[in-house]
């Protein structure tokens, strides 16, 4: 099982898809949200919204599940953890984000990063209508939200090299280079 995390705009999703395709295993990325919603018995829009907000805490939660007063964030995280563990138990796969590196510490955990200009350039290729100036604050904001969410469940671990087996600078070697390094690493640890 391989987990992929990384900075916004680094190419982590594309790399995950490339790895899964090369290995002939399932890739779980955008489709995870629907599985988590079903597992947690919550609306899909709430799961997707959790990617856009800071995590709430038991004490300061605005949204609570009425019956047991568990915060919505915790309910969704527990469903997320259950889905990720189940998918990993079903066999080899590649799982994108959603604290999977914390949930599956024994997987091959990969972090993809790149300098800010590289990441902005990648996003502008997909969204040329966006300005470079607005993208800079957007990219940093997404990274901060992602870090806050993950650190609510694994303090101090998101983005730290000690958390991952491989940290790849996609801005230096490109996604093809990242794929080559990853496949070589996987061959070495089998």
Walk through the language-model features, giving the residues of each:
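Glycine-rich phosphate-binding P-loop
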Residues: 4-20
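Short beta-strand-centered segment that lines the nucleotide-binding/catalytic pocket of NTP-utilizing
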Residues: 25-38
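ATP-dependent small-molecule kinase phosphotransfer cores
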Residues: 37-92
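Small-molecule kinase domains that catalyze NTP-dependent phosphoryl transfer to phosphate-bearing small molecules
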Residues: 55-57, 131-176
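Short, amphipathic alpha-helical "lid/cap" segments that border enzyme active or binding sites
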Residues: 81, 175-183
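Divalent-cation
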Residues: 97
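Conserved phosphate-donor/acceptor-positioning beta-strand/loop module used by diverse small-molecule
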Residues: 105-126, 130-142
